A protein has these predicted regions:
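Short, solvent-exposed polar/charged micro-motifs at secondary-structure junctions
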Residues: 1, 21-23, 126-132
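Flexible, polar/acidic helix-loop-strand segments at domain edges
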Residues: 3-79
Length: 152
């Protein structure tokens, strides 16, 4: 994925990686390339409860930066979306066609974008593993808000 856009610059959101990777200090602007992108998006301290939540935050930051960079590349070359699809094909299983991906990239380029949200709940320490307990009432409300339109 990182090869398809080149380097991406992000701001490190927290110190969750700093013990193993001092370059990832909270507030530091870092350039992600093939040598460090995987560390940024996949690493977590499995000895620290709820470290997966911090990792998810870094993944969201990476995806936003990736989309911004892809939009720039698409603005320079309308064929970029097709090139991206071809570059990703060996690493993915999808029913999204190349034409559909091109349309998705075009909609992002037109600032139609998307709304990002997290399933409401809280992380707790279980007997053996971290657990995420969903707030069922809040999830129901968010589901109705997101997927249903009131008849008038």
């Amino acid at each position: 994925l990182s090869k398809s856009v080149g380097v991406i610059t992000v701001t490190v959101p927290d110190d969750s990686l700093v013990d193993q990777h001092p370059e990832f200090t909270a507030g530091t602007e870092v350039t992600l390339d093939e040598s460090n992108t995987e560390i940024f998006v996949r690493s977590r301290d499995t000895e620290t409860s709820q470290s997966a939540i911090a990792r998810l935050g870094r993944q969201k930051i990476y995806i936003r930066a990736f989309v911004d960079k892809a939009k720039e590349l698409y603005a320079e070359d309308a064929g970029y979306a097709a090139k991206l699809y071809q570059a990703l094909t060996p690493y993915m299983v999808t029913n999204i066609s190349q034409d559909r991906l091109v349309k998705l990239v075009q909609s992002i380029d037109q600032d139609k974008g998307y709304e990002e949200w997290t399933i409401p709940g809280e992380g707790i320490q279980g007997k053996e593993y971290d657990e995420y307990v969903v707030d069922d009432d809040a999830l129901y409300e968010k589901t109705v808000e997101t997927f249903y339109v009131e008849k008038k």
